[in-house]
Amino acid sequence: MDHIRNFSIIAHIDHGKSTLADRLIQFTGISDERTFKDQMLDNMDIERERGITIKSQAITLPYQAKDGKTYSLNLIDTPGHVDFSYEVSRALASCEGVLLLIDAAQGVQAQTVANLYLAMEHNLEIIPVINKIDLPSADVERVIEQIDDELGLDSEGHLKCSAKAGIGIQDILEAIVKRVPPPRGNPEAPLAALIFDAHYDPFRGTIIHCRIMEGTVKSGDTIRFMSNSATYRVEEVGHFLLQREKRNCLSAGEVGYIIAGVKTVSDVRTGDTITLDDRPCSQPLPGFREVKPVVFASIYPIASDDYDDLKAALEKYQLNDASFIYQKDSSAALGQGFRCGFLGLLHLEVVQERLEREYDQSIILSVPSVRYRFTLKDGSVVYVDNPAHYPGSSSIELSEEPYIRATLMLPERYLGAVMKLCMEKRGVNSTLNYPSPGRVELLYEMPLAEVIYDFYDRFKSVTQGYGSFDYELIDYRESQLVLLDILVNGERVDALSQIVHRDRARARGLQACERLKEEIPRQMFKIAIQGAIGGEIISRTTITPFRKDVIAKCYGGDISRKRKLLEKQKKGKKRMKMIGQVSIPQSAFLSVLKSDAD
Amino acid sequence: MQVHHNFFISMQKPKSQSSKPVGKRRAEDNPGLYLHIPFCEIKCRYCDFFSVTELSRITDFLDAICREMNLRGKVFKFFDTLYIGGGTPSVLRPDQLNRLLEHLHQHFTISKEAEITLEANPADISVSVMKELHSLGINRLNIGVQSFDNRILEFLGRRHNGRQAIQAIEASLQAGFGNFGIDLIYGIPGQKRNTWIKTLEQALTFQIPHLSCYQLTVEPETPLGQSYKKGLILTPDNDELFELFMDTSEFLEKAGYCHYEVSNFARGDSRISRHNSKYWHHIPYLGLGPSAHSFDGEKRWMNVRSLEDYIQRLNQGKLPMEFCENLTREELQLEALFLGFRTSAGIDLDDFEEKFGWNLWSVKERDYELLLDAGHLKIVNGRLQPTRTGMALADSLALL
């Protein structure tokens, strides 16, 4: 156990986390140049493109240190977005130390701080690493000052590197060995293993990623998930190298995988504790939380013939994403589809993109919604996450919506703008803290619905990217809610309906009309777009028809070219949804949630 | 390269096998022949047709195109329209044209009633030359007038002026060309609606049998396109162009022209361009010369867009083909629709069903009904026809 180090790299986006991970992997020699693919830990295309890590990943690096001993360094990569902050906390709970990576040119940024706080919560050894020191714009001295002043860390122990150029990599590895404490735990104790992720393998079923805190697990053992007492027989355990490498057992302090015939990823809960069925530990590891979706939207195939394909794609997708849930749904305007639950808007966008890219689905997403609670006049209580199921204002006794506590960290100079934004988003009960000079922590209680409605984008924009944001659900509170419908040429499009606060209704109606006007291409007919509450029209716009599209000349040599152009247009049209005679592009459905950027 | 042996068969097959009376087969269903003369004295700023200004290459080109006739003539026989376009075919001397036509007649059968059109630049037209051309069998002229306004002609980079345009029309009439057409361009940056209508009025004074009125298309690969890209010119917006289109159509129809295709107007049905109509009615055509396209009912192919390649390949006894595509039923269908909606004749619903095996009207009835109500379409004698506003929307109509 003395030869094990469990660590994570935390950083603001684009400060070089994935590049450093790659370099560490390369340095320890488990991957040669030939098999090396940049940013090995970001497996999904989307992760690589967006530069964010969505799923946690782990890899064991064998490293022969200068003291002559060989260590197993377990690098646990973490997701980088507030939607996944729970997953991050579970990954950090599996570590004893972190590399806090800071861009030498950009210095300390919002996520640097937010991640630092997360790491401190888990009492981790923090090693500040200044990256990109070879950049012409690098200002190492300034970053060192920031480490002292803004982060409140001792800059003495900082390291310098350029992950891209491969400078300073060995020093980092040495520091991990010397400074990150070896894991503690008793291999003879009853098993307690923390699940920090799981993924699906088509041949082996679910692969559970875990950190063994206490005890030992080996193949043949019967394990029990403490959250639901489900038991499974262990088929295989091992370490993550470039591929999975089978081991006889995993013992306290180690990071690795367990394969135990678990059919789907959704049977595994991140943060859950695994123990042995015949010799359980006395209590589960702390911090477990049932992850519940907070944002809901319906997914429909663009062509109704593709319903079965979409169904199959969702089934497959869910194997790998336990936090995604769905059930059958149908819409008058869009036909058969599925109502889905997501951790947040980013999660929703990721699911949408992956369904399109990896599963080749052409889909429409309805306007996202939170889950409202209505007490009806007959005394019954209903939860509604789909505006189509809005009970009707005359039967409602009490309307409630979910509230969150938002924690916002930002440089003091943005305080005014952020408070204004929070008030606009119906934030209440604010608390203001000064954790370090120049930096404020702002706590607000606000409706979750306001947060999914473009809060994050606007917060980032008013703080110029220096703000970090986290939230937790607190409770349901009474609210004045109404159903806002959108009519396209007089036809109600249920997938565009939203449940909104009464005071916001008119503004939202206007905004929805304006957004749709931008998103829906002009067509041969005039298109009227209206926002309505009950029977009352509260907003209206018109998309004027285009009147000419024909080219002047079309002779023998022009026909093939013209045909190809039209075929392209036709393809584009196929990706739109027909509502009556109006073609509505996919983007329109999400656009109604976006407001004007200030 | 045996690619087009079925030129004739393919176009006759569906007709002869159908249960329709043979009488419905129209004379204009015969293929048309196109010759591309890729020479211009100067290049106009807006034009992206293939041509070169090295007039010294004319002799070699004539040798080459005659070789192409030898190769194609073995398979293709009968045509009832011939269109000599370019480029500027009128840069050829009458004796050169004569050589071309003689060689053509040796290898192809051109109907005695064939429409034989030559494109001509007003600057090349004189009574004597036109008389000579007439005697060679050319019976229709298409004159690239574009405008009578010198400022516009200069903007377009034409080598003639307004006076020459008028003289060319008069000379053509004098030389005995009862059938001829002129090209005009509108929607030019800075051109006022009134200026354009004045141009039309001027054209009307000559009772010109055929008018092609083209909205200026800014092609990216032209000097004009470059100016546009740099922001040096401002083109009218879509709504303005629509208004101009409508004004043109109304004005000319009032003056007795039929607006039979998006950009084409004829003084009576007998004056329509029979050759160009073949393109819009999806009738086969054979194109000779560099960059010329051909269509046999199933395939379309294109000759190389380079004079030197063209000459070289034919010197080696090879066909100068650059690309050839086999059209799928779906592609043919789309073509039939977007071409059909360009013409006032529209689409014959029975013909369409016979050709493609499904009934256009019953499948798209909901859309079409709305368009009938909106006044973009009409049904006349089993034909689905665009109205004036419908013609402007031909592309969208085809995509429904």
Swiss-Prot record, chain A:
Keyword Nucleotide-binding: yes
SUPFAM superfamilies assigned to the protein according to its UniProt record, in alphabetical order: EF-G C-terminal domain-like (SSF54980), P-loop containing nucleoside triphosphate hydrolases (SSF52540)
Intracellular or extracellular location(s): Cell inner membrane
Catalytic activity: GTP + H2O = GDP + phosphate + H(+)
Any one cellular-component term (Gene Ontology): plasma membrane
Disulfide bonds: none
Keywords assigned: Cell inner membrane, Cell membrane, GTP-binding, Hydrolase, Membrane, Nucleotide-binding, Protein biosynthesis
Keyword Lyase set for record: no
Enzyme class: hydrolase
Membrane topology: Peripheral membrane protein
EC number: 3.6.5.n1
Entries under InterPro entries matching the protein: EF-4, EFG_II, EFG_III/V, EFG_V-like, EFTu-like_2, G_TR_CS, LepA_C_sf, LepA_CTD
Alphabetized GO MF terms: GTP binding; GTPase activity; ribosome binding; translation elongation factor activity
Binding site for GTP: 14-19, 131-134
One GO process term, biological-process aspect: positive regulation of translation
Domain tr-type G: 2-184
NCBIfam families in alphabetical order: lepA (TIGR01393), small_GTP (TIGR00231)
HAMAP family: LepA (MF_00071)
Descriptive protein name: Elongation factor 4
Source species: Syntrophus aciditrophicus (strain SB)
Lineage, uppermost ranks: Bacteria, Pseudomonadati, Thermodesulfobacteriota, Syntrophia, Syntrophales
